[in-house]
Amino acid sequence: IRDRTGDVRMAQYRLNRELAALYAQKARQARYRGLFCVVSDPVDPLCRAVLTESNRAPNGEMDYQGLFSHQVRGFGLGVMNARAAYYARKDPRFASFLTEGRSFGPHGEDLVIANSIRNYDDALSRQLTEQAVRANLRMRELGFKPYIAPALSSGALSLLLCLRGQWHCSSTYLDGVFMGARNRVLPTGTELERLPLPRQLQDRLQITMDRLRAID
């Protein structure tokens, strides 16, 4: 847990994990086979907790009789993608994001924004990432609690796109962690968008995945 970084979402983890674990066990008991959607912060670690706890037997051992990984999905990236698009419309330096950019990772400090996949600029991408991450703090400085934008962009709108089988931003299971990326739900399972990622962008994504993996 990276509480020392000041990321409020990580400070929420222990409390929300207990609640997530409770409902994960209920899903196990009901042999639930639908989607288990997580919208509470921090989304990605909580998704992992849901998957783990649903597969834990009453004796504490893992028996893998609970949810499948493809059933668990987190919704936190949509609002960060929307915030990046907002700043891209305001600042011509970031305009390429609107047609060529992508958002990855968690809803928080380890967010990864790429200004463009085709013409990736690491410095610009990091600046746009910082703008999106700090948007919450700017709203709070103005005296508002930012909850409407996440409820729409990460919640309602992304959930509807997901249920319709359309492309959207959400967190899915990937190499042992839940990671936000553009994907869609097909009858055959989850389809992640496959892109030729620049090496610098791959390195940023690996750092984020390693940090997510370290959260217990």
What residue ranges belong to the model's regions?
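Rossmann-like dinucleotide-binding core of oxidoreductases
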Residues: 35-115
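Short, charged/polar micro-motifs that form catalytic or ligand-binding hotspots
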Residues: 13, 36, 40, 146
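Long, compositionally biased stretches enriched for glycine and/or charged residues
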Residues: 87-216
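Rossmann-like NAD(P)-binding element
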Residues: 1-35
